[in-house]
Amino acid sequence: NATDATLKLKHIASIGKEKIDVGDPVIEVKVDKKGKKLHIIDQGIGMTAEEIEKYINEVAFSGAEEFLEKYKDSAKDSGIIGHFGLGFYSAFMVAKKVEIISKSYKNKPSAHWTCDGSPNYTLDKGNKKDRGTEIILHIDKDSKEFLEENKISELLVKYNKFMPIPIKFGTKEETLPLEKDAKEGDKPKTKTVDNIINNPSPAWTKQPKDLKDEDYKSFYRELYPMQFEDPLFNIHLNVEYQVSYTHLR
């Protein structure tokens, strides 16, 4: 949902329907083990209170499908994923309560929706100032494994490794190259950077002419980190006729 929200915003901006400063949007996932909460934050299209009523409170109403229909002449290649309007509700499989705090890209107040999985919910004015949506899962006592960073990291990599929007999960230390005038025995410096768990631009999204042999080897190692030998060969086809497809092996 966070990916779709960001892709929608990018598409609206790209076709000039609205004047939007998209920037470099990132999806952030945060674990609050002490508070027993999981946060998913995006900088996408956001929702008004009316849109939350429409897209969240109506089961099986797909906002993605509606968007694709509205912009059917230009959005077919936008990469939007959702289709059935049901994915959000899986949150209640692990959460005893879910909150949505959202501010639309439109000039309207933010909204704050809360539900415990029953037919009852609250929808109030929010205090969010920045565009986008934050989902807060209050993790149930029977699903404590979803408060473990290793578990969340594993799931993010497994299901989002090649999502087209960068996904931040904490930070990491990055080793900087030694300076040219470094002396023997000098240790390289490190800096703290965002830990981006996915590759938003994998090899198959690029043209073969723009890739070198080392790019394919790097992609192979990314797919098979425990395989220490280089691939024997690679085949990369981009075919467009009545049906277009990309093939990389």
Model-derived segments and spans:
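GHKL (Bergerat-fold) ATPase N-terminal catalytic module, capturing the glycine-rich phosphate-binding loop
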Residues: 2-141, 145-146, 154, 161
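GHKL/Bergerat-fold ATPase module in large chromosome/replication-associated machines
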Residues: 80, 98-120, 140-144, 150-249
